[in-house]
């Protein structure tokens, strides 16, 4: 019995020792990882170091023209036109990127800036933080996959990976938040009512004599793609320019079913643009779209 108890005590001691070694190694590994991270951070060259949340203004030109965005009350806007339907994820990604740029190399004793193409920068990105501090990044020539970069007012030249440009490499059209458009076809179109010059024409799916007409207008409604805009935030006083004022426009009201419930889509059709399109608006939207004459003719059954 004593031998048995002694064996159990030995096994218990070994187990305790193994547990102690395990936790000791785990602690040591964690310390080593933390140390490695600290060393890596210490070796990292920060070109910019500003929290994205603190950035309130972005101004840049990376080959798509001058663009500027501002943030007010945590909301981003296109600075020249606050009514522009901006997808906020774009400036948010830009701020996240530009506020935390690291360099591959820091060239402290290099050539003059013209040797790096920084006397006439290819691109510029400027941001301002909530305290009014401004930083302007100048992008010169490329070296491999990197750009030569410097901060305006600072003589230090860095190499920065070209991916820094990616979040900025969009046109204003790319960053527009366009309206949603429903899926409409002959299978779910219930009725279409067209009002023009005070006269109303109705196409009803329950009228068997209008089966061909319903198929035609449903084909037109189903072919609409809200992908090209002529004006992103039209003012009421400018609607007549597009033939979309109340006295000039054609009103199309389409009743359709979605998830077994009836929905109403209201379209306004205006003038032709001279290039094979017509100006079109959705009810309650400020965006003027371009839709082909052919599609509009099908919607109007002409």
What are these regions, as identified by a protein language model?
Residues 1-302:
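Secondary-structure "cap/kink" motif recognition
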């Amino acid at each position: 019995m004593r031998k048995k108890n002694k064996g159990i005590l030995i096994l218990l001691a070994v187990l305790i020792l193994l547990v102690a070694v395990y936790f000791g190694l785990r602690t040591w590994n964690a310390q080593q990882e933390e140390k490695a991270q600290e060393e890596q951070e210490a070796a990292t060259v920060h070109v910019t170091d500003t929290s994205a949340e603190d950035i309130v203004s972005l101004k840049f030109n990376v080959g798509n023209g001058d663009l500027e965005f501002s943030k007010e009350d945590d909301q981003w806007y296109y600075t020249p036109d606050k009514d522009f339907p901006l997808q906020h994820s774009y400036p948010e990604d830009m701020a996240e990127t530009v506020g935390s740029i690291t360099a591959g190399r820091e060239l402290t004793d290099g050539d003059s800036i013209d040797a790096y193409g920084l006397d006439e920068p290819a691109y510029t990105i400027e941001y301002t933080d909530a305290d009014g501090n401004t930083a302007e990044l100048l992008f010169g020539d490329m070296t491999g996959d990197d750009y030569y970069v410097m901060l305006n007012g600072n003589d230090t030249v860095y190499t920065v990976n070209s991916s820094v440009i990616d979040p900025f490499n969009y046109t204003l059209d790319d960053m527009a938040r366009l309206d949603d458009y429903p899926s409409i076809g002959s299978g779910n179109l219930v009725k279409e009512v067209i009002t023009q010059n005070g006269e109303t024409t109705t196409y009803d799916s329950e009228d068997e004599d209008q089966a061909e007409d319903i198929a035609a207008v449903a084909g037109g409604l189903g072919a609409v793609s809200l992908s090209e805009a002529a004006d992103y935030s039209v003012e009421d006083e400018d609607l007549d320019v597009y033939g979309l004022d109340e006295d000039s426009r054609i009103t199309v009201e389409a009743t359709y079913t979605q998830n077994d419930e009836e929905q109403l889509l209201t379209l306004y059709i205006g003038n032709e643009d001279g290039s094979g399109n017509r100006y079109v608006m959705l009810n309650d939207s400020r965006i003027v779209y371009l839709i082909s004459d052919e599609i509009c003719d099908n919607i109007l059954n002409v």
